[in-house]
């Protein structure tokens, strides 16, 4: 797959770098007409003042505004456009705001403290999840009495179905904010708990996934944290490094299945799609990798579901509840690509995340379903260099730097892409910069690139989406969801019920639908074949 991606990107570079700006854009009437149309839409925009039967929160981990813009360019170019003019699915939501992401104790946050903010409505400390700032990192004794409750938990208490979907392990910081309370985000299994934490009764995150609340749908990675130590992985039985890790010999999947008569566990795409059409399935757990799921471009799409597919399956299951649902969907590996200074991985993950948003938007009605899209934090990721419009987002700036060497438009402030260890910066060319495994250069050496501290965007559509406005604390996201859904502490919301009900269509087409990115790559390669040879 990686070789095909290289050819695809090189082909895009050939096609786009030779492209011309559309002639109509030279005419002022083009821009005036476009703005007038946008103004007309804005004037007709009316808030939907009913309650939200359903709430979906899409969380792009590390998807700061620069990442959103770069993803827009990439998706536009992959569809044969120049790039920046082509809207993402999230761009088309009518309400947008900015969210302040700091933790109580950190100006630049991590994904644990931020998850507490946007999922529970309370800011917490760095590396802690589901607890107030009175709890201290790694101090188990400070957990009890400082737990805070997620909106997902409150939605479940209100009778709604709930689900968690992620491309990371389901025990990772962001999804854990929906169900766990821990003073250390890395306590994935009991093997990670220090002796004092075990002695003081702290539970690992995987155990809390099963024990803390009734979650109807759980989809992502993280198999090894659920099974007893030494249990062979079903997909990689000969690789002992991914065996189960639980020291107390607990099989948490079996424990979860025993709680629900209609519970089904799956670990591959085929079984997932079959479960989607089985009306007897009331609870669905799909764990598709021992730890985090693979990057989309590295997946075997006959075995590994895409985020779009997982989102659609989750929607089919939770939408069976006449009282509605709450669904958390995370594009978690956007963040991991950035931490590695690998922009290709980050941006293609963000593109797939946007595809999942588009699918949810298609399957649900804005009259009864509130959809929010946001990020937990940003990254020290930027793109510049006065590149020509239509230049590949992974391409080079048109002029050289003061050291007479080329540089990529995308650069990082720090991270493993630091390249001055030999005393001078290495040169880079188009072939190198378009390689999916290429690490963009970074100014400061770090084993892992750091988060950025700037505000992130919040996009919204549906009932009460108009409350997304201005610049707010990240905690406001949770309170909008709680108010729109009329769950604690807003059970007296006094909002009328929606008049239209979302109805998810049959999922039989899922098994036959090729993954969007693979399909797109294949189509583009066919189109570009004459220029490549």
Curated annotation (Swiss-Prot):
UniProt xrefs under Gene3D superfamilies: Alkaline Phosphatase, subunit A
Domain of life: Eukaryota
Signal peptide positions on this chain: 1-19
EC class: hydrolase
Alphabetical GO biological process terms: dephosphorylation
Keyword Cell membrane on entry: yes
Disulfide bonds: 140-202, 486-493
UniProt-annotated binding residues for Zn(2+) 2: 335, 339, 451
Propeptide section residues: 507-533
MF GO annotations: alkaline phosphatase activity; magnesium ion binding; zinc ion binding
UniProt: Ca(2+) binding residues: 235, 288-289, 304
Lipidation positions, renumbered (GPI-anchor amidated aspartate): 506
Residues forming the catalytic site: 111 (phosphoserine intermediate)
Catalytic activity: a phosphate monoester + H2O = an alcohol + phosphate
Primary residence: membrane
Residues involved in Zn(2+) 1 binding: 61, 111, 376-377
Record-level GO cellular component terms: plasma membrane; side of membrane
Binding site for Mg(2+): 61, 174, 330
Cofactor(s) this protein requires: Mg(2+); Zn(2+); Ca(2+)
Bilayer topology: Lipid-anchor; GPI-anchor
Family from the record: Belongs to the alkaline phosphatase family.
PANTHER family: ALKALINE PHOSPHATASE (PTHR11596), INTESTINAL-TYPE ALKALINE PHOSPHATASE (PTHR11596:SF30)
Primary role: Alkaline phosphatase that can hydrolyze various phosphate compounds.
Subunit details: Homodimer.
Note: In most mammals there are four different isozymes: placental (ALPP), germ cell (ALPG), intestinal (ALPI) and tissue non-specific (liver/bone/kidney) (ALPL/TNAP).
Name this polypeptide is given: Intestinal-type alkaline phosphatase
